[in-house]
């Protein structure tokens, strides 16, 4: 919802936004509604999404938000299905859970796929600051750093894809 709000506030002329979300265990409509109630300032956005949220079955679902030229793509499958798609991302928001809780997300193979699916100067962020996550992102080719977090999170991991001789090999 915040991405949508920021897009709407900062959109240039006829710009378009494609937001792709991989959801291995999508929340029920009831649970989403309960979460959204805590964010009153985003009420208009949440009402639209709740009205249009797809059923929870494994598939690729699309919601077009015509007024703001946003194509929301909800992939109800785990992130390892990324290999079946063809796109380049400017930004990734990764699972913030501990690698022990969601090991599928934190593999060298997936880090390399994320790198290959990221535009030059594209970024990635996650609440996970585990050493093997940072090392895996580095090994994949990202420039990685720990940056100040917010709320109860002291630090987060931030990575960016920069051009280098290694990335062109």
Question: What are these language model-derived features?
Answer:
Residues 104-121:
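A short glycine-rich, Lys/Arg-flanked "PGG" loop and its adjoining helix->strand segment in the class I
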Residues 1-53:
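SAM cofactor-binding core of SAM-dependent methyltransferases
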Residues 22-24, 106, 129:
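Short beta->alpha hinge that forms the Motif I/post-I loop of the SAM-binding pocket
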Residues 129-140:
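Short alpha-helix
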Residues 33-86:
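S-adenosyl-L-methionine
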